[in-house]
Amino acid sequence: MVIGNRVLLPLTKRYYNARYRKVLHPELREEIIAHNCYCEEVNSKLHFDDEKIDPGISLKTAVPSYDKHVMLISDINRGMAKKPGVWKNIWESRIENNTTHPYDIISKLNFGPGVLFNAISITSSLESFAPTSLEFYDFLVMPDMRYYRVKKPDIEKFSQYINSGHAVAPKLSFSDYLSGKAAATTVSNNNQITLSLDDSIYYRELKNDAWLFVCGHEKRDMRCGIMGPEILHSVNTANSKPLVNNTGIISHIGGHKFAGNILIYKPIENQNGRKKVDSLWFGKVTPFNVSEIVQSVNEGVIIENNFRGGLSL
């Protein structure tokens, strides 16, 4: 299975994270009824039968194989103000088909197959970000835990820096991967020299705090477009204080039939001076169970019912 240009791998021991205790959540009758009713409500807004959510479908344990995640920040001002989001009105089914800023730079980003790429719209954060400017392109990068601000002439330099240690990706379409014509694998390029950035590219270290992203790519899949904002609203309002300080909507991360889908990045203690971040993927998430899923992660517990898989980056 693939998403974008990433191979989805079954959950194996390589991706099992021993830092978490995995538990099966016993589903109470009231919870099952609430879940089914919510799915029916979402289905009533969908036009085609093949879009309908099946609440009884089994969740597959599969995650993308990657070791770096580059996220293009979309329209910071509007996202942070919680006005109608770019994920609803601006993001085309294929993000690269957008010709306006900042998406016009995507064709210039030639990342290796070990690099996952998405667009995001930040909805809340303890971080401060510069206002959207046509002169710059803004990125979050995991596990670097950095915010980068790059001018257009420096995009190639930025790509080379991100690609340090990776083979350059071939130019392939999403349909190539769906049809099996191409196989994307994580490749380490032993001849690649690790590059450093000069002063022409601004970056800032992020606070050592978790991030939560919810797929809300409406023009790619209406299910996520409906559920994503509702799930985020629940995360931010279910308790007296937010369960996660940094949240956003993310473009296509696969598994639409398992909507809603969330991705949590949780920093862990540095090992040998190197930053480490846990990447945790969950599916079949609704506004009714997301708080428990996130709270459990905060406490070092993974609810296995909703766990798609994870990696330590």
From Swiss-Prot:
CDD domains, sorted: TRX_Fd_Sucrase
Spell out the Pfam families in the cross-references: Suc_Fer-like (PF06999)
Q: Which SUPFAM superfamilies match?
A: Thioredoxin-like (SSF52833)
Q: Which GO terms describe its biological process?
A: cell redox homeostasis; protein-containing complex assembly
Query: What does UniProt give as GO cellular component?
Result: mitochondrial intermembrane space; mitochondrial matrix
Q: Which family does it belong to?
A: Belongs to the AIM32 family.
Q: What is this protein called?
A: Altered inheritance of mitochondria protein 32
Organism name: Candida glabrata (strain ATCC 2001 / BCRC 20586 / JCM 3761 / NBRC 0622 / NRRL Y-65 / CBS 138)
UniProt lists the gene as AIM32
